[in-house]
Each structure stands twice: as structure tokens, then as C-alpha cells.
């Protein structure tokens, strides 16, 4: 299997604790957060990764090189910010498989990718989203499904419970080859939340371990927790 990891963001909210590093290079137990994503992908049978880089991409390339944890690495470099959607579209030009895993570089969600891939294929989905059940939260929006089909997205705000977008996807390459797609766009706002009615988007619910290091509090939480899951 093949995966795209989005590691090109500026990580502004984490600057107060990791000022000189790209967010996926934030250290946890003397290793960058991205190391743990590679560990996870290796366990899930991923053998090829495209790192979608931007901010301080040389630092990432120097550390990970062309092979890491038994996974071959190729690079898709943003010379200017393209948004998450533009970054994915550009990275897809370097992929070789029809269906590809996409992962946010600041999130670790230990979902069973093999089962998720089977579900994606069985539904003949355009896109499958890994969804994490949560209770009492306001940092995330929620994804509503009916018979696994995505039927709505609800905005961020207080939710007593719901399924959040866990930042792990399996996408059919064809949906990013559409000529109408801009070279710069947000994957979440401009694509997911606008295309789910026209395209076949499905949810894959998993209560596996999830951590998002996008803010200082959760980065500190990851430093305490990750050792128990790796």
C-alpha cells in the first residue's frame, strides 16, 4: 500500500513550544513525531510514502532520507503554500496506485488500515474517512453518517458526543484528477464539505488511540502517552 503524509504546514499554534521545527519534527522521547507515523504505517503494511513537504522541508529530508523504517520515501515539495487540498493534488502526481492512504502529519490515529482498505474497496468509495468517536469536546467538528455513507459535516463547537474526522483517509486517485480542482484549496473546507453529496464518501469508525499535536496541551499529552502505545 501507498500513503501520502501531509507535513508542509507552518504549525503556528505549536510555535510557543517548538519554535524552530516543522510541526511533524516536534520531538517526543528524542524522536520526531513523524517517526511514530512511520512506525505505524510500517505495521500496517505501507511500503511507499510520499511526504508532502513545504516549511523547512530540508530538515525533514535530511532526517528521513529516501527510506525509513523499511518504507521507501518520495518527496512532493510545495514551493508556495497550496493548502491541504493543493498539497494532496500535487502529491498524487507521484503516486502509482489507484487507492492511496492520506494522513495528516500532526495526527496519529492507530486505525486498522487493512480493514479500512477492505471497506473502501467493498463500497467502491471515492473516499473513506477514519472517524474517531469522542465525548464532551469542542475543538473538532463532527461527521454524520448513515449506513456508513457521509451525509453531513457539523462545524466546530461543543458536542456532547460524536464522530470526528481522525485525519486518516483512503482516496481514489481519480477524484484528484478532475480539471475543475484548483491548484490551491483546502481539502477540508473546499473539498470534503462541498463534494460529499456528489461523490461517494464513507466513514470508517474506529475507537483506536488518537492524538493530534496541533496545540501545546495535546503535544504535552502525546509526550506522556505515546510510549504506552508504541
Swiss-Prot record:
<dbReference type="InterPro" id="IPR029044">
    <property type="entry name" value="Nucleotide-diphossugar_trans"/>
</dbReference>
<comment type="pathway">
    <text>Nucleotide-sugar biosynthesis; GDP-D-glycero-alpha-D-manno-heptose biosynthesis; GDP-D-glycero-alpha-D-manno-heptose from D-glycero-alpha-D-manno-heptose 7-phosphate: step 3/3.</text>
</comment>
<keyword id="KW-0548">Nucleotidyltransferase</keyword>
<keyword id="KW-0119">Carbohydrate metabolism</keyword>
<dbReference type="InterPro" id="IPR050486">
    <property type="entry name" value="Mannose-1P_guanyltransferase"/>
</dbReference>
<keyword id="KW-0342">GTP-binding</keyword>
<dbReference type="GO" id="GO:0005525">
    <property type="term" value="F:GTP binding"/>
</dbReference>
<dbReference type="GO" id="GO:0045232">
    <property type="term" value="P:S-layer organization"/>
</dbReference>
<keyword id="KW-0547">Nucleotide-binding</keyword>
<protein>
    <recommendedName>
        <fullName>D-glycero-alpha-D-manno-heptose 1-phosphate guanylyltransferase</fullName>
        <ecNumber>2.7.7.71</ecNumber>
    </recommendedName>
</protein>
<dbReference type="GO" id="GO:0016779">
    <property type="term" value="F:nucleotidyltransferase activity"/>
</dbReference>
<dbReference type="Pfam" id="PF00483">
    <property type="entry name" value="NTP_transferase"/>
</dbReference>
<comment type="pathway">
    <text>Cell surface structure biogenesis; S-layer biogenesis.</text>
</comment>
<dbReference type="GO" id="GO:0009058">
    <property type="term" value="P:biosynthetic process"/>
</dbReference>
<comment type="function">
    <text>Catalyzes the GDP transfer from GTP to D-glycero-alpha-D-manno-heptose 1-phosphate, yielding GDP-D-alpha-D-heptose. Cannot use ATP, CTP, dTTP or UTP as substrate.</text>
</comment>
<keyword id="KW-0808">Transferase</keyword>
<dbReference type="InterPro" id="IPR005835">
    <property type="entry name" value="NTP_transferase_dom"/>
</dbReference>
<comment type="similarity">
    <text>Belongs to the D-alpha-D-heptose-1-P guanylyltransferase family.</text>
</comment>
Amino acid at each position: 500500500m501507498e500513503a501520502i503524509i501531509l507535513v508542509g504546514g507552518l504549525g503556528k499554534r505549536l510555535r510557543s513550544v517548538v519554535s524552530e521545527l516543522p510541526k511533524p519534527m516536534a520531538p517526543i522521547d528524542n524522536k520526531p513525531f513523524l517517526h511514530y507515523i512511520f512506525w505505524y504505517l510500517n505495521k500496517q503494511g505501507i511500503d511507499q510514502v510520499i511526504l508532502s513537504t513545504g516549511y523547512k522541508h530540508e530538515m525533514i529530508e535530511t532526517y528521513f532520507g529516501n527510506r525509513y523504517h523499511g518504507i521507501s520515501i518520495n518527496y512532493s515539495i510545495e514551493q508556495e503554500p497550496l493548502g491541504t487540498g493543493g498539497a494532496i493534488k500535487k502529491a498524487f502526481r507521484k503516486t502509482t496506485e489507484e487507492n492511496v492512504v492520506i494522513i495528516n502529519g500532526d495526527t496519529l490515529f492507530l486505525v486498522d488500515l487493512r480493514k479500512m482498505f477492505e471497506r473502501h474497496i467493498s463500497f467502491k468509495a471515492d473516499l473513506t474517512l477514519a472517524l474517531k468517536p469522542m465525548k464532551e469536546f469542542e475543538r473538532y467538528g463532527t461527521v454524520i453518517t448513515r449506513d456508513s455513507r457521509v451525509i453531513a459535516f457539523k462545524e466546530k463547537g461543543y458536542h456532547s458526543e460524536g464522530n470526528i474526522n481522525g485525519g486518516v483517509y483512503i482516496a481514489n486517485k481519480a477524484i484528484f484528477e478532475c480539471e475543475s480542482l484548483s491548484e490551491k484549496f483546502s481539502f477540508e473546507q473546499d473539498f470534503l464539505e462541498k463534494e460529499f453529496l456528489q461523490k461517494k464518501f464513507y466513514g470508517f469508525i474506529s475507537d483506536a488511540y488518537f492524538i493530534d499535536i496541533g496545540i501545546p496541551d495535546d503535544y504535552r499529552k502525546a509526550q506522556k502517552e505515546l510510549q504506552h502505545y508504541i
